[in-house]
Amino acid sequence: MVDEATKKTLAAIPLLKTKAGPRDGKDWVDRLKEEYTSLIKYVSNNKEADNDWFRLESNKEGTRWFGKCWYIHNLLKYEFDVEFDIPITYPTTAPEIALPELDGKTAKMYRGGKICMTDHFKPLWGRNVPRFGIAHAMALGLGPWLAVEIPDLIEKGLIKHKDKSESSR
């Protein structure tokens, strides 16, 4: 089900070891260190491959994540806010990644702009607890979702490039 390029990307993202969620005190701090290490490596790999497509940061507790993601289509950059909370049952439960400004624009999205990752991503996540983390959610969840949905939304006219929408006023 996973293509060779995705397998290569995944192999380069460090796996996590600590099975801890936000209520697990010191273990959660250890898990957060692993999460940051994994994310930094994934972003670094993306930059080296000229495939840089998101920035994330978290609140002090590491329970709320936010940032930007972008998708290049026909040489135009489409940028979106991205956000998610770490579930109390994390890492058993994957985070639900949201792109709030796209809420209601596609059937592959839940209320609040949460992207649909049920069919393909969640079973894979479940088989890889606690080894998968936020970087894996981005690589296997948001990345493929953007690649499928954004061109379709642009084609249907539901998303307009910011420069084009400003010049048409």
Curated annotation (Swiss-Prot):
The UniProt record lists the keyword Transferase: no
Keyword annotations: Ubl conjugation pathway
GO biological process, one term: reticulophagy
Signal sequence annotation: none
Classification via InterPro entries: UBQ-conjugating_enzyme/RWD (IPR016135), Ufc1 (IPR014806)
Gene3D superfamilies: Ubiquitin Conjugating Enzyme
GO molecular-function term, one example from the UniProt record: UFM1 conjugating enzyme activity
Hydrolase is among the record's keywords: no
Active site residues according to the UniProt entry: C116
Family note: Belongs to the ubiquitin-conjugating enzyme family. UFC1 subfamily.
Task of the protein: E2-like enzyme which forms an intermediate with UFM1 via a thioester linkage.
Protein name: Ubiquitin-fold modifier-conjugating enzyme 1
Organism: Nematostella vectensis
